[in-house]
């Protein structure tokens, strides 16, 4: 099984938490791919972090692997110039370079770093993707405003099953990179994927963007809106433990949080968002 994360040094905590939650629910060997890059304002993830994460994960299965790819040179050649001065975070675009990493073969499950696994997902991972480039869940809010509002086919890109073989055949990611470079868009990487990809829609339990449900497989800690008693924008990430408890009423991942705490040394605790 192949899992992919992307980002800079600021998301290491999210990657580690997500990986721990996956290993709790999947017993087979997993390749965890991490794509990172050095861009102005962003420090790349270090090999030291990847090595430590692999060492911890191998206590659960000694065949788990963590493979770090620094794609700074390739990223610089496709900088999303049209979107660099927007709210867009360029690190989100790193996943669109997976086709340029030869080691990432066949099928890979991409996860945002604020996604935690709650149940086993083998059935989803093994679904037939022969006719599709990507599979995902409709975006909780975007499905009403983008794509086909009747079909709800505008996907949230936080959990995506990627058919890398087909993506390379169709040059999907190359087309998306060019679109992000040349055209100013709202959430450019997600918009480009939705516009250009041949996509398969899957049940919402595989990317639950709302309240926890009994059938939740992946919980995605996205920004949400509350309308009563007053309008409020709510953004809570899984490493914000008190807010996760008090504002979201989510306690289902406390064992993962405690495990994460247990593998940090004192120096890391002092600099870790979880403790600040």
For every predicted segment, state its role.
Residues 31-38, 136:
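Short internal beta-strands
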Residues 212-276:
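C-terminal catalytic/acceptor-binding lobe
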Residues 46-100:
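Active-site-proximal specificity loops/subdomain of glycosyltransferases
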